[in-house]
Amino acid sequence: MAKYFGTDGIRGEVANSTITVEFTQKLGNAVGSLINQKNYPKFVIVGQDTRSSGGFLKFALVSGLNAAGIDVLDLGVVPTPVVAFMTVKYRAAAGFVITASHNKFTDNGIKLFSSNGFKLDDALEEEVEDMIDGDFIYQPQFKFGSYKILANAIDEYIESIHSRFAKFVNYKGKVVVDCAHGAASHNFEALLDKFGINYVSIASNPDGLNINVGCGATCVSNIKKAVKEQKADLGISLDGDADRIIIVDENGQEIDGDGILNILAQYSDICGGTNGIVGTQMTNMSYENHYRANKIPFIRSKVGDRYVLEDLVKYGYKIGGESSGHVINLNFGTTGDGLFTAIQLLAIFSQADKPVSEFKLQGELMQQTLINVPLTKKVAREDLQKVASDVNDVEKRLGNRGRVLLRPSGTEPVLRVMVEADDKSLATNEAEYLVEKVKQKLV
């Protein structure tokens, strides 16, 4: 079991968890020393979101890397997918992002990309963890690394997207965008300006403390309200580091990551094509049934965009994602990318003269009830055996009307209890039953 890494890097409350200056410096030194051991290029890229703690954590990371003899190129405040993109483009050994994604500003963390722009696999994470727990390694003074800032790094990313999609995007509707006061602030607007989109931007004034507060992809009510007030045709909401996207239609109705994947699947020719779709254990059964009815191969990965990526590579598919809004298209990128997904959607919406609501899967979706149960410590999968009989009882009562999923969070001491059924009250009642059993046996 990983000691430091969760499902998406390392994350926690600043100063009251693993996320300290001391740890971040050791992480930088550990990765730098591993780069030396493997004889990779002695050069990495770093970026950050808008949290107030981002600066001092970044410089702690840089100091550890420089001590190990690694040169650092700092992109400043940029979306996470920009770091992945630039890591590949500049042939860096690794890319780091100081971010806690959709979490509150008091949290922070580190996401880490390998030279191919993919997140680290479990084996490489274990190597990094072993190095963290080892000695701090200094290179001889004449081999210390350098630190440089690359201004306007977003421009190269924007130009890459524009060169591929300019011929497809001719969207005439009015768009509202919610940047979560995060890394997309100003950067997403620059991308939309390049494509000539008519938009109104909200939650794009970061102050270091307001990231994800009442806004962004985990607070969809903000974009729903704005779409109605602006009488807009489309709303696009990103999270703090812009690797997630949720959209709403002209009626203010949410289309989550599952729905976005379905739209991309219908118009995959515009998006580079795919032989199948990868969802996750959380993907609504209605979409799975739809894919199978239309002979579109579909598989479920574990929750976490790096697991989606692993299965995309394993099965040779190109498009996949999560209900939460991580969407990956391997035709053009290597990680969840809210900005690029938005441009793909705008390209699709430009091709047909119909409202966004008509691109959605028609009919009622299966009803999901998801309850997060706080625990005193992270729960291991073997702990779930304590409630296995209770889960079995619920599954028997549901029969073929639904399913159950109990999933420990990879980033915090929380157990996610999800019940899906063809009736909302049934899903809610059974979920609440399981929550009580979890509290009795695991809390």
From Swiss-Prot:
Enzyme type, top EC level: isomerase
Known cofactor(s): Mg(2+)
Active site: S101
UniProt EC number: 5.4.2.10
Assigned GO CC terms: cytosol
Entry annotated with the keyword Chloroplast: no
Entry keywords, A to Z: Isomerase, Magnesium, Metal-binding, Phosphoprotein
Binding site for Mg(2+): S101, D239, D241, D243
Co-factor: note: Binds 1 Mg(2+) ion per subunit.
Pfam family, any one: PGM_PMM_III
Disulfide bonds: none
GO molecular function: magnesium ion binding; phosphoglucosamine mutase activity; phosphomannomutase activity
Modification type Phosphoserine: residues: S101
Top-level taxon of origin: Bacteria
Segments crossing the lipid bilayer: none
Keyword Phosphoprotein tagged: yes
NCBIfam families: glmM (TIGR01455), PRK10887.1 (NF008139)
Function comment: Catalyzes the conversion of glucosamine-6-phosphate to glucosamine-1-phosphate.
PANTHER family cross-referenced by the UniProt entry: PHOSPHOGLUCOMUTASE (ALPHA-D-GLUCOSE-1,6-BISPHOSPHATE-DEPENDENT), PHOSPHOHEXOSE MUTASE
Full protein name: Phosphoglucosamine mutase
Species: Francisella tularensis subsp. tularensis (strain WY96-3418)
Gene name of the encoded protein: glmM
